[in-house]
Amino acid sequence: MKTSMQRKLDQLSTRLAELNDLLSRENVTADLDQYRKLTREHAELGPVVEQYALWRQSRSDETAAQELLADPSMRDFAEDEIRSAREGMARLETELQKMLLPKDPNDDRNIFLEIRAGTGGDESALFAGDLLRMYLRFAERQRWQVEMMSESASDLGGYKEVIVRIAGQGAYSRLKFESGGHRVQRVPATETQGRIHTSACTVAVMPEADEIGEVEINPADLRIDTFRASGAGGQHINKTDSAVRVTHIPTGIVVECQDDRSQHKNKDRALKVLAARIKDKQYHEQHAKEAATRKSLIGSGDRSERIRTYNFPQGRMTDHRINLTLYRLEAIMDGDLDELIGALVTEHQAELLASLGEAD
């Protein structure tokens, strides 16, 4: 283990001991905000220090076994103990490296998932609907909550554009690598000659901004228009101007919401999506220079980058960022994304570990 890493782990062990002392004091709950902060830090440090204690025990076992090598009658036993201790230390060190990786501050946030039909006309819109169903089925498996924010349906079904809010533990950390271009290759239902068509959609995954002032939006920078909602909804939907369009003048970002009969609720939803889009824009501008100097395999979130191909005739899905091909497309389209997401997370961790190694 590198000296810098061991020094860091020693510091965390000392800090955990301090937290144990602070949390054992009688008046610890006098300041509830401080108490919550301390318990959260304790919960984060506990597993790391526990793993480090196991690593130190393995190192101690190796040292003890080394001393037995001089005794011929104990040599075989000692060599087995040394080998076992070193294997344990290597495994624990890898786990500790992952635990020490810098955390994405957005990982625990809820998200807005936006899917837009791209090239391919009606077939692209139909595929946007298929992608939405895939993500909704995945969210259902995670027991996350889903709320429709905005939708623009196409004539033959599917969506020209759809935005949903997904709320649940780890929503952003699990879905953040979905941003980018998704290409589909299949025979459309309208194709009479049986020819395979290629079309595409773009997906954007945006962390939800905090309720209180995380993204400052000056009301003077907003243009808010109301209009009559279109599409399904019966006669009532055409009687009032319940649909809302919010334009953020400095950035040109436009959000429309018309899914609710209440103009107030539509405006509230539109402002939430707008805040997330502004936050997302700021994030990508902030990381543009970094991305230019060190091209990351995944996590760039560039909407124009084609990240994945879904080939229906061959029953395969290929993620181009990590060269992963899975021949289980039906299960994937039904929301079974664990293997795919796990591979992306593992690759991302490997990139972070490599960058930390370069820094050392």
Curated annotation (Swiss-Prot):
Gene3D superfamilies: 3.30.160.20, 3.30.70.1660, 6.10.140.1950. One of its GO terms (molecular function) is translation release factor activity, codon specific. SUPFAM superfamilies: Release factor. It is found in: Cytoplasm. It comes from the Bacteria. Transmembrane segments: none annotated. InterPro entries: PCRF (IPR005139), Pep_chain_release_fac_I (IPR000352), Pep_chain_release_fac_I_sf (IPR045853), Prokaryotic/Mito_RF (IPR050057), RF-1 (IPR004373). Pfam families: PCRF (PF03462), RF-1 (PF00472). Methylated by PrmC. Methylation increases the termination efficiency of RF1. Keywords: Cytoplasm, Methylation, Protein biosynthesis. Belongs to the prokaryotic/mitochondrial release factor family. Peptide chain release factor 1 directs the termination of translation in response to the peptide chain termination codons UAG and UAA. This is Peptide chain release factor 1. The lineage of its organism: Bacteria, Pseudomonadati, Pseudomonadota, Betaproteobacteria, Burkholderiales.
